[in-house]
Amino acid sequence: MKITKERLLQIVNEEIATFSAKKLNEATRSTIAIEDKNGKVRGTYIHSDGYLDGVGEVLAKHYKDKKKIEKLLDLGKAGISALYKSIDGGDDHSFNSPEKGETIFYGRDRGEDNDMTSQFKDRDAFATGHSEEFAYMYSMKDKKWYS
């Protein structure tokens, strides 16, 4: 089968339109964690968009409340595929068909039961002990995110 120049151009333009229409997640791994008032740190794994303009920005804008951060970590015990502003889920939300703006959890949304959490004795141990490209820690004492 011979493809004409016009047909090849049409295929390329369709692919470009498809990429432009979708928000693609990049597998830049990160760890998010919370430091309690005693200095102990607990965290979990996030698979996608771990860079500052991804997970870092979402955390700074939408995760300022201690209870929401703790719920995020609790729901993320089996890991988090992609972090968005909401952690509520919903009847129509699933791993394969996520609702827009909903965080995608491996446990709640895909039924996995892995333990992707980590525990550290203090923030120094967290800083040197995680294995992902990016790490974010919320300090309950300081009431702010560190990266």
Please tell me what each predicted stretch does.
Residues I34, G43, Y51, K68-I69:
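Catalytic phosphate/metal-binding cores of nucleic-acid and nucleotide-processing enzymes, i.e., regions
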Residues R29-I34, Y136:
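Short beta-strand scaffold segments in enzyme catalytic cores
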Residues N25-T31, S48-D53:
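His-enriched metal-coordination microenvironments in redox/metal-binding proteins
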Residues M1-E26:
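Protein-protein interaction and targeting regions used for scaffolding, dimerization, and localization
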Residues G43-L59:
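Glycine-rich catalytic cores of cysteine/serine-nucleophile enzymes that process amide/ester linkages
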Residues E35-K40, S139-D142:
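Short acidic-glycine loop/turn motifs at beta-strand connectors
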Residues H62-S147:
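Low-complexity intrinsically disordered segments
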